[in-house]
Amino acid sequence: MTFKVGASYKEYQSEGSGYARQTNAAPAMPAGTSIGDLTYLLEGFGKNLDLPSGSATAWISPNLDAIMKAYGADCLCDTGVAGGDFRLLGLENGSTALGNWRDVTEKDTGLWAQLDWNTEWAGMPVRGNFGARWVNTEVEAAGYSALNGVTTRVTGANNYDDILPSLNISVEPIENVMVRFGAARVMSRPPVTSLVPTLSLSAPNAANRTASLGNVNLDPYRADTFDLSLEWYFAPESLLSFAVFYKDISTYVQTTQQKMTYAELTAMNPEAFPAAPDRPAGDEYTFSTPTNTPGGPLTGFEISYQQPFTFLPGAFSNLGVQANFTHVESEIDYCTTAACNAYVTANLVNLSPDAWNATLYYDDGRFNARVSAAYRDTYYQQVPAANGGTRGIAVTGKTETLSIDASASFNVTEKLALSIEGINLTDEANRQNHSELDGVRDSTYVYHHTGRQVFVGARYKF
C-alpha cells in the first residue's frame, strides 16, 4: 500500500472591459441622402424552414457600411452635429458600456490524502485507491452600476468549502476481464460571467421594466457520482465494454426571474440599486439573476467496442473499427415561477439522451484512411426559455444531427506525405428550435448551413 498527501493553491483572475457610444441617438439624415441609399433588399429568407404559405421572405435591411460613411460614424469622433457623437467611451460612459467592465479573482486552496493498493483477493488481482480532498474557494468580484449620472463600483465576495471523497476499485476476476467501480463527490465552480455583480437596468419609464445582476454568492455545481463497468480485452488492441453510471446532482445553477419592487431591489443590494428620485420605490421590475436550484438524478449506460481486424486475410487485416453508444436519462428540476417555488422536470440541458460514434479505418503503415459517423439526439439548451409558452413550458433546443467525416493520407516517400479530409459529408445543418415541453410547437429560430468542407494537403519533412 502507498499513502500520499499533497496540497495545492491556484489563483485565477479575469478582467473585462468595453467601449461604446454614450447614446444611441442618431443625427438627422445628411442632405441629399435617401432611405434607398442606406438600405438594401434582403431576399431568399426561409429556405429549408418549411415556412407557412404567405410568409415574408424578403424585406428592407440597413446597409451598415453605407450608414457609417453617410453619417461619418467611421471617424469614431464627435462630428459636432446633434446626435453625431460617435466616440467610444469606457468607464466614463455611464449608460451603455459599464456592463462590459468587470474583474473577478478566484483563489483555490486544497489539501488531499490518498491510499493506493495493489493486492490480491481470493486469487484475483485487486487494485485501487481511496482518498479525500478538501478545497476552499474564495471569490472576489466587481462590476459597475450607473444611476443619476453617478458611476458606482459594485463589489461582492464569497467563500465556501467542500470535502470531496473518492473511491476507485479494479478487479480482474478472470484473465483479460476487468470490473471497475468508482464513487466520488465532485464539484464544478460556476462560470465567471454568472458571478460578476454587473448591473443591467432598464429606463425608469420603460413599458416593461427589467433588472439583472450577477450573483457572487452562487454555490458550485455539486454531485455524487457512481460508475460500474465490465471490460473484456478479448484480443490485442481490442476491447468490448459495458458501463452504467448514476449521478445525483444536488446543486445546480439556473438563471431565474421574479417580480420585485425597486424598494426590494434596494434592500437586497443597496450598492447596485441605490435609492433614486427617478426610481419610485413601488415600481415593479422583472429581476433576473443566476440562482442555485435543486438539480436531480442522471442515469445511463455506455457500450464501447474497438478491434483491429488482424484475423482477416491480406490487406483486409489492416482494417479496424471503433464504436460507442451512450444512453442517458435525467430528471432535472427547473424553476418556472417568479418566486421560484414551482418546478418542471426535464432533461439536463446540452445533454442528448442518445449519442453514438463509429469509425472504420485502414492503416498499413504507408496508407491510412478512415470514415467516421457521429450521431447526437435532440437536446435542450434552455429550460424554461426566455419567451414563455402559451400551451406549456417553453424550451429551446437543437435538433438531432448525423455527421460523416472522412480522411486519408499517403506517404509518398519518407519525407513527403499527401492528405485529403472531408468534413460534414452529409451536409448537416445546425437547426435550433423554440418549442414547448408538451411538444405542441416547434419553431425554428436558428438555421446555419455551412455545407461540406474538403481540405487537401501536402507535408514535407526536411
Specify the residue positions occupied by each region the protein language model found.
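Extracellular loop and loop/strand-boundary signature of outer-membrane beta-barrel proteins
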Residues: 96-102, 147-156, 211-216, 286-292, ...
